[in-house]
Swiss-Prot record:
Organism this protein belongs to: Homo sapiens (Human)
Swiss-Prot/TrEMBL keywords: Calcium, Metal-binding, Repeat
Composition bias type Polar residues, residue spans: 134-146
Annotated spans, Disordered: 134-154
Name of the protein in its database record: Calcyphosin-2
Binding-site positions, Ca(2+) 1: 439, 443, 450
Superkingdom per UniProt: Eukaryota
InterPro entries xref list: Ca-bind_SignalingProt, EF-hand-dom_pair, EF_hand_dom
One function term, GO molecular function aspect: calcium ion binding
All residue ranges annotated as the EF-hand domain in the record: 426-461, 462-497, 498-533
Length: 538
């Protein structure tokens, strides 16, 4: 029986070749002439034009097998499609691809590529250097549009302080970099979203406090007075008989021209808009007071200031209350004692002092101390630059004395820095406990002999000249006693406000009950420095 298959010429089994065998290159394409020469077909069978069969661009090169090179399985082997002497094309090509992706087999970069890489690296470094210089110049030109004598005198002191904090910021930068390598990408995204949410919440908090300040101090319009028109009401009541169903006159007729209410100030929104906003914290050994969120405002029109406290109850309830009433205040200690606060006294790290007896609304824990000390942690730098441009303040000779005081403390701190390098934590914690033992009265004040004894016990000896100079600066009131917290901050130094803000934030996270104290075991549970660069390096 003869079988006729339309469209495909039938060939004998002996003429069929194995399926996987490549004898022609991959780019070879079929033509109708080659097909007709090799296989003649009857005239009734239409010709197949295989020249239009072309690979698509998205197909892999090894997935296309031309029909001329594709061999059907040999009839002599019924166990497999591949003869023992042949290798499957796909396996051969995949092995070849695996060899190509091994990094060790990659060719070395050419000199041209190396040159381009060095040029690109140099351009990036130069661009970043110029960018940093531009930012520094802009900041310097904005802040020091008119260089004050304070900046000219204590330039050396400021440079020493920057050199002292450079190591800390460098370590922090390394820790952040190491943290970026150690954390997962999901953790990075989650941390970035959390940081953005915290920034938005902080800005919203400041806006709420600023609005409350405006509401409290703006001149309100006179609405009504419960005692207004009292004489008119009495006259009309003489002629009209009392009626229980009739609405009283004080509710029926309200006029404003005879009111007795008078506004105490003429403040307007435009006047109050010229203000400097800053964040502050209380310098105290009481943990609850130290964690209070304070936001202050200094008004340039009358050199007055006010401080508000932001309180949060739970997640949704908040309250803004005045902590220091709006008034004109003066320094209560230091070289500027008795001098009125002005714009130059407000900067990050500045200390504002108030008499606790002048503010009856303060908490009892703060009233126990004679002075209330507030440290400025953050400030609106844009508003400060704008207000400094508008106002021309004259510096006095006190700036020179304050600069010399900072240089005295800086010299003592440099001497003690080497001794505190390897055992700083133990010395600081031990020194604090020792001061508490010496403080029999519990007010935090110690005399000169106690401080000398403490320095000797912890092997922190300083020269007699430096100690006397520091004592004269700290004992400004002349009563022979100094707060041991101020003494420790003066001779040893303290953390900058940027880093201390993170410490306060971590403390408030652990102190969820707002008790003002955290057990050391809770700190050990949460504190982990294994990802810090110095810990990793050993």
């Amino acid at each position: 029986m003869d079988l006729e298959v339309k469209g495909v010429a039938a060939t004998s089994r002996s003429q069929i070749q194995p399926f996987f065998g490549r004898k022609k290159p991959l780019q070879q394409r079929w033509t109708s002439e080659s097909w007709t020469n090799q296989n003649s077909c009857p005239p009734v069978v239409p010709r197949l034009d295989l020249g239009s069969l072309v690979d698509s661009d998205d197909e892999d090169n090894f997935s296309y097998i031309p029909l001329s090179t594709a061999n059907l399985p040999n009839s002599s082997s019924t166990l497999g499609w591949v003869t023992p002497c042949q290798t499957p094309y796909t396996q051969y090509h995949l092995n070849k691809l695996d060899q190509n992706i091994i990094p060790e087999n990659l060719p070395a970069p050419t000199d041209k590529c190396k040159l381009k890489y060095q040029q690109c690296k140099t351009e990036i470094k130069e661009g970043y250097k110029q960018y940093s210089q531009r930012n520094a110049e802009n900041t310097k030109s904005n802040v020091t549009h008119k260089q004050s004598p304070r900046n000219k005198i204590d330039e050396k002191c400021v440079q020493d302080e920057e050199a002292n904090t450079d190591d800390l910021t460098t370590l922090d930068r390394k820790a952040i970099l190491q943290q970026g390598y150690a954390d997962n990408s999901c953790d990075k995204q989650q941390r970035a979203r959390k940081l953005d949410a915290e920034i938005v919440a902080a800005e919203k908090k400041k806006q709420i406090v600023a609005e409350q300040v405006m509401i409290d101090h703006l001149s309100r319009a006179v609405i009504s007075d419960p005692e207004q028109n009292l004489a008119i009401e009495q006259k009309e009541s003489d002629h009209i008989l009392p009626d229980s169903k009739m609405t009283p006159l004080r509710f029926r007729k309200r006029t404003l021209h005879e009111t007795k209410i008078r506004t105490h100030s003429t403040l307007t929104e435009n006047v109050l808009s010229h203000k400097l906003q800053f964040d502050g914290r209380i310098v105290s050994r009481n943990g609850r007071d130290a964690c209070r969120e304070l936001i202050g405002f200094f008004f340039t029109h009358d050199q007055s200031l006010t401080i508000y406290e932001y309180r949060q109850f739970g997640k949704n309830r908040t309250n803004v209350l005045p902590f220091i009433q709006k008034s004109i205040y003066s320094h209560q200690c230091g070289r500027r004692k008795g001098k009125q606060y002005r714009l130059g006294d407000f900067y990050v790290g500045a200390t504002l002092t108030f008499l606790s007896s002048d503010h009856l609304s303060l908490p009892e824990s703060i009233k126990e101390n004679t002075l209330l000390k507030l440290r400025i942690t953050n400030i609106d730098q844009i508003a400060l630059d704008s207000l400094k441009t508008a106002s021309m303040e004259q510096e006095d000779d006190i700036i020179i004395q304050e600069t010399n005081d900072r240089l005295v403390f800086k010299a003592i701190q440099d001497v003690l820095k080497e001794k505190l390098h390897k055992r700083g934590v133990r010395i600081l914690t031990g020194l604090g406990k020792y001061f508490q033992q010496l403080d029999k009265e519990g007010n935090g004040l110690l005399d000169k002999a106690d401080f000398k004894q403490a320095l000797k016990v912890f092997h922190l000896e300083v020269s007699e000249k430096d100690f006397e100079s520091a004592w004269l600066i700290l004992n400004d009131n002349g009563n022979g006693k100094v707060d041991y917290g101020e003494f420790k901050r003066g001779i040893i130094g303290e953390m900058n406000e940027y880093r201390k803000s993170y410490v306060r934030k971590a403390f408030m996270k652990l102190d969820f009950n707002k008790s003002g104290s955290v057990p050391i075991i809770n700190i050990r549970k949460c504190y982990c420095a294994k990802k810090h660069s110095q810990v990793i390096s050993g």
